[in-house]
Amino acid sequence: MTIAIYAGSFDPVTNGHIDVLKGALRLADQVIVAIGMHPGKKPLFSFDERVALIEASAKAVLHKDAARVSVIAFDGLVIDAARKHGAQLMVRGLRDGTDLDYEMQMAGMNGTMAPELQTVFLPADPAVRTITATLVRQIASMGGDIKPFVPVPVAAALNTKFKS
């Protein structure tokens, strides 16, 4: 069985993340969505909220394939999380050349530390290429319409978060 790991902060999960997740599911039997925990950062959504949003979004968008997705937290190196969970592939999404430059450096470092783990780059669909979680949070905080950028469960959660 091929297992892929897809790491990020997912604060919140966006349609861009879901696009990469769909691509990962074409390559692997199981995809682990790994939420990185950074002690110095204050996320908008708690870990439990992000897990719930990823799971709800996967069910809403991926339907039966959602059963092939699991969500974990990790701190430290993603390669350690990949090893712990038996992943052979590390999936990374690319929006533009800036992402490529950064991700190539990371793939090189990860490849040196964990040669058994193959990094796979998935170019973002043009329809989601400009979406970032940071911009989604900013738009939502100013009362803008974020529905084109996030799955329905995330739009509802953002609207609730910023109305309170």
UniProtKB/Swiss-Prot annotation:
What residues bind substrate, as annotated? 9, 41, 78, 92
GO biological process, alphabetically ordered: coenzyme A biosynthetic process
Please indicate if the UniProt record lists Cytoplasm as a keyword: yes
* Residues bound to ATP: 9-10, 17, 93-95, 103, 128-134
User: Is Iron-sulfur tagged as a keyword?
Assistant: no
Which compartments does it reside in? Cytoplasm
Q: Which InterPro entries match?
A: Cyt_trans-like, PPAT, Rossmann-like_a/b/a_fold
Keywords annotated in UniProt:
ATP-binding, Coenzyme A biosynthesis, Cytoplasm, Magnesium, Nucleotide-binding, Nucleotidyltransferase, Transferase
| Pfam families linked to this entry | CTP_transf_like
Q: In which pathway does it act?
A: Cofactor biosynthesis; coenzyme A biosynthesis; CoA from (R)-pantothenate: step 4/5
Q: Which reaction does it catalyse?
A: (R)-4'-phosphopantetheine + ATP + H(+) = 3'-dephospho-CoA + diphosphate
Q: What does this protein do?
A: Reversibly transfers an adenylyl group from ATP to 4'-phosphopantetheine, yielding dephospho-CoA (dPCoA) and pyrophosphate.
* HAMAP family assigned to the protein according to its UniProt record, in alphabetical order: PPAT_bact
Q: What is this protein called?
A: Phosphopantetheine adenylyltransferase
The organism named in the record is Brucella suis (strain ATCC 23445 / NCTC 10510)
